[in-house]
């Protein structure tokens, strides 16, 4: 029995004019646009070429992501580890805004250890909409050397925004580095902190 052996390059070289056999029999991969529109296909094997639809989608997505109004998806704010944090260091003040809406002032401890402020929150298991949950987080921030550590303050607003702040001293003055706990005071009004 004579079997004609044809080099696969010969078939692909005539690709646009040569009809494909049952969509090239790539059953597990679905249809490619060159199966439906063979004049758009090239002579490269379908395993190595990128589909036209994929090329168009990639260019559209990259174009959308370059716009200033595009904001990537933020994780759910149920976990304090994922909450947005805002740290500001102006000429005369250092401020940290932290969303801790699931914690009461009794659940929070704020300490200053040398050049760092440590914020720790922990509450025992309690019931919420989905069952029982316990939460805990630990944050540590380096304080600028010019912050007056004797005048640090910390407050928790009614909407759960923790604000840690301290004034900066002029250069040449001692900032008073020591270890001490900062009490968390409860406010009755919502925070005026900027939205994230």
Curated annotation (Swiss-Prot):
InterPro entries: A-crystallin/Hsp20_dom, Alpha-crystallin/sHSP_animal, Alpha-crystallin_N, HSP20-like_chaperone. The modification N-acetylmethionine is found at residue 1. The modification N6-acetyllysine is found at residues 93, 122. Residues 170-196 are annotated as: Disordered. Zn(2+) 3 binds at residue 177. Zn(2+) 1 binds at residues 123, 125. GO terms for cellular component: cytoplasm; nucleus. One of its GO terms (biological process) is lens development in camera-type eye. The modification Phosphoserine is found at residues 45, 145. One of its GO terms (molecular function) is metal ion binding. Its main location: cytoplasm. It is found in: Cytoplasm; Nucleus. Residues 176-190 have a biased composition (Basic and acidic residues). Residues 76-185 form the sHSP domain. Acetylation at Lys-93 may increase chaperone activity. Residues 1-63 are annotated as: Required for complex formation with BFSP1 and BFSP2. The modification Deamidated glutamine is found at residues 6, 50, 170. The keyword Glycoprotein applies. Keywords: Acetylation, Chaperone, Cytoplasm, Eye lens protein, Glycoprotein, Metal-binding, Methylation, Nucleus, Phosphoprotein, Zinc. Glycans are attached at residue 185. Zn(2+) 2 binds at residue 130. Belongs to the small heat shock protein (HSP20) family. Heteromer composed of three CRYAA and one CRYAB subunits. Inter-subunit bridging via zinc ions enhances stability, which is crucial as there is no protein turn over in the lens. Can also form homodimers and homotetramers (dimers of dimers) which serve as the building blocks of homooligomers. Within homooligomers, the zinc-binding motif is created from residues of 3 different molecules. His-123 and Glu-125 from one molecule are ligands of the zinc ion, and His-130 and His-177 residues from additional molecules complete the site with tetrahedral coordination geometry. This is Alpha-crystallin A chain.
